[in-house]
């Protein structure tokens, strides 16, 4: 798969994840945010909770369990730490979530997956 095709697939997965989150009461407040230490695919808010979300797409649902690793989560957490002042208010709960997507499957939302 070319870099452009992978990028397009990632964007489609992020749109699908954002749609799913909106259906479940979340408001998308940021997308595809890059900082020197990492990247966050989506930032969502529901009430006093702000979630920094890594989105992963795999062609086979069986591969989803291997889609996320500690290295990737550390980078998302580092990016979230830099971005938190921009999206979170005092006393908000901040967490790192993962959305796993595959063809013909409902998205799987894993909440609070990273604790430093």
From Swiss-Prot:
SUPFAM superfamilies: Restriction endonuclease-like. InterPro entries: Restrct_endonuc-II-like (IPR011335), tRNA_endonuc-like_dom_sf (IPR011856), UPF0102_YraN-like (IPR003509). It comes from the Bacteria. It holds the Pfam family UPF0102. One of its GO terms (molecular function) is nucleic acid binding. PANTHER family: UPF0102 PROTEIN YRAN. HAMAP family: UPF0102 (MF_00048). Belongs to the UPF0102 family. This is UPF0102 protein Sala_0262. The lineage of its organism: Bacteria, Pseudomonadati, Pseudomonadota, Alphaproteobacteria, Sphingomonadales.
